[in-house]
Amino acid sequence: MSVSIKPLEDRIVVRPLEAEQTTASGLVIPDSAQEKPQEGEVVAVGPGRFEDGNRVPVDVAVGDVVIYSKYGGTEVKTGGTEYLVLSARDVLAIVVK
């Protein structure tokens, strides 16, 4: 997937995964009651930040599925798709399948 957003420093661009539409028992959750997703696929990664004159690379790669902070990042929409630009510090974990 080609994204027209190029993150700077230790920022990453994530495409949020869809929120659950139904509960485990089959009840439909209305849009107004759904929680914001906290899981998404990394679609672009910045080069890393500088610390003491050395570039520190970002720990995630394009294609990784990550769990991120609930209130982290900035929502942007481009090409009809919504993305989230996060600092690498807002990523809590990489989902290993």
UniProtKB/Swiss-Prot annotation:
Molecular function via GO: ATP binding; metal ion binding; protein folding chaperone; protein-folding chaperone binding; unfolded protein binding
Residue ranges of the TM segments: none
Subcellular location per the Swiss-Prot or TrEMBL entry: Cytoplasm
GO biological process, one term: chaperone cofactor-dependent protein refolding
GO annotations of cellular component type: cytoplasm
Principal location class: cytoplasm
Alphabetized UniProt keyword annotations: Chaperone, Cytoplasm
A UniProt-annotated Pfam family: Cpn10
InterPro entries, sorted: Chaperonin_GroES, Chaperonin_GroES_sf, Chaprnonin_Cpn10_CS, GroES-like_sf
Subunit record text: Heptamer of 7 subunits arranged in a ring. Interacts with the chaperonin GroEL.
Function summary: Together with the chaperonin GroEL, plays an essential role in assisting protein folding. The GroEL-GroES system forms a nano-cage that allows encapsulation of the non-native substrate proteins and provides a physical environment optimized to promote and accelerate protein folding. GroES binds to the apical surface of the GroEL ring, thereby capping the opening of the GroEL channel.
Family: Belongs to the GroES chaperonin family.
Name of the molecule in the record: Co-chaperonin GroES
